[in-house]
Amino acid sequence: MSKITADVLLKEGLPKSIHLKDLKKLNLSKMHLEMKDIDPKLFSQMVNLDELDISHNTLSELPDNLGLHNLRILNFADNHVEDVTVLKQFPNLEEVIYEDNIYLTVSDNYKVFCLLPKLRRLNNKDITSLANHVRFVNHRELSNRVEAHWDSKFKDNLPDKPSSQKINAVAKDFIKSVVNNIKYGPSSLKEFVRWKALGCSGKKRDSADDCTEGSPTKRTRIQHELQSIPLSPRKSNRLQNSPLSLTPIKRKQETSTQGTPSKSTETKSPKVALKSTPSKKQSNESSAKINGKQKLSLTPKIIQKALDNIEPLHFLQCHSKNNSCEDFKTQLWACAFEPILDSSSPKAVATCGGDSVCIIDCETGKVMKKYKVTGEEFFTLVWTTLTMIGKDEQKRKINVLAAGGKHGVVRIIHAKVSLCYGEIKAHKKAISIMCFSPKQDTFLFTGSYDKRIILWDIGVPDCDYNFRPSQLLTLDTTSVPLRMCLVPSCPDEFLVAACEDGCFAWDIRLDKKQGRRSYEVELNFPIYKEERKDNDFHVIDSLAFLNEDIIASKSVMQGSIYLWSWEKTLKTRKTKNVKKLDAVILAQMKWSSSETPYLVLSTSPERYCVFCGDEDGKIWIYDLDSCKADLQRGKLCSVVKEPTKILSWPILFSPKEKVEKTLINVVTVDPTMEYLVALTDINIVSIWKIK
């Protein structure tokens, strides 16, 4: 008679209930259980079971039909289990422990990586990065070797119209040959390679069964050599390979697409006192001691409100070279708000430019953290939130900041503890842009001046901050990627990038064979038809999603911002051979007639707003809430939309210089629309309070 009954399960399970279906957690450890004690009919009633502990028993195997489809954590350590392939019945497993099963080897670990797509921890260690490398990179390589083996040894053995008997005979020989001849990795993984190759050859055999004529052709692999010439990109040379000149001829003004903002929407410039030597007695002092050095910040004395509901709050010089208050030359390039982990955390924004990355408390203007690398020039940064296991074995969420720039190195920073715990030599040229996947918190895309976008799995650090990054995918671009976004409705399928020669989309699905890919489609815009000798308007310097479908983008010197539908544009593609699509424009918004490149727009999906700075220090704000319904329905708007508001740059005073206007390189707002942050070309971080 089985030791395990319904009463035993209810007694050992949590939460306490009289129904098996209510159990979330079950501990059957140290009960001397054998295989015969596990009744699948009984276990399958626990449809909501989340965690199962059957460690320290004498189980030789696990039943293959337990029906626990929602199981996330499984512990069967210290048993006698010999086969892990049975775990594929638990597709939602995130953590497995099977230490001290003496028959299980490192090859079994690799099998588990492939069988369980959501697995993140194995035997109390984070395996995210390694597992994804095995699932995708190793799988692609083994599949290619199996396919090459078929093409070179067995393809010609099949006639044009093979009989089922002939297919079976060839398939049998092929599988046997694969097992004996396909080699990959160290000898300790021999069993895994054999198992994996057997699976790949089985798929090849299945494809042969479906053939009525011919056989699969070998895939041609594209190989490119990495360029090793270093590049130090700045605003003055970022367009050196672009058809747009550095001093372009000004476009003739067109009232339908560009022009200066109307007086009714523009605010006058308030006068602001710029203090470069903070006093200890000042209540709004914004200086911070970092590594023994004083940070200078310039907090304005507000004389006049910029708008009724948006006021300038702080103007900081926290990226100065040698902490000099006279540095008005350092260019600031990127900013991002730190994700909120708890309500007590201050609203913080990370900024980068020059050789430093700063994290600033938006309310106080205090520089809380500063990370500096001598000789580096940071161009981009991005946040992600990881689940880390501490030395106490407790899970906790941490915010991690990735920053990159001129040296092509991604620096990974745990800001809360002021620790840069990792560096990834991602590219041989400068990194221009990065983004994390909203679906996979360890997936980081890096775009570079080497004309490549690379997908990395940065993994999760252990309690000693050891981590293991893995390169999963390479996307070839035809020019430098300037901005990029994952499509929100399918972030594991498509990536869209704005580049120096156009806008492109890539298929990023990792289950495809190609580990290196060119773009899937190129997006064309109406402004292209106005091409001139000095400008073809293909330099797309801004791109951001307004919701899951609508994209805001602009070309340099376009004088307007497009709102276009990703879904409607993709639907116009009749066949996969079509490589160029006309973007389906839903609306057009008037913007500055600026000739300056790299003035980046941003969006607030929560509030349906678009923000963009210009060459005069103005911040253009487009509140699209009133036309939200029309945009979501895909209704076209034939009238060029005016900005809702334009914030003017306040007149700043410092002891030696008056700053009346500047380039606004990037503008962003926090998700709750409390703060607006704008970065300039003259080493000033401006923080505005949204009332």
From Swiss-Prot:
The text the record gives for the protein's domains is: The entire WD repeat region is required for the interaction with ORC complex components, as well as for association with chromatin and for binding to histone methylation marks.
Q: Which UniProt keywords apply?
A: Centromere, Chromatin regulator, Chromosome, Cytoplasm, Cytoskeleton, DNA replication, Kinetochore, Leucine-rich repeat, Nucleus, Repeat, Telomere, WD repeat
What does the record give as the function of this protein? Required for G1/S transition. Recruits and stabilizes the origin recognition complex (ORC) onto chromatin during G1 to establish pre-replication complex (preRC) and to heterochromatic sites in post-replicated cells. Binds a combination of DNA and histone methylation repressive marks on heterochromatin. Required for silencing of major satellite repeats. May be important ORC2, ORC3 and ORC4 stability.
WD repeat coordinates: 426-466, 476-516, 535-574, 593-632, 659-691
LRR repeats, residue ranges: 22-45, 48-69, 70-91
Which gene specifies this protein's sequence? lrwd1
Query: SUPFAM superfamilies annotated for this entry?
Result: L domain-like (SSF52058), WD40 repeat-like (SSF50978)
Q: Does the record carry Cytoplasm as a key word?
A: yes
> Which family does the record assign?
Belongs to the LRWD1 family.
Pfam families (UniProt xref) = LRR_LRWD1, WD_LRWD1
Protein name in UniProt: Leucine-rich repeat and WD repeat-containing protein 1
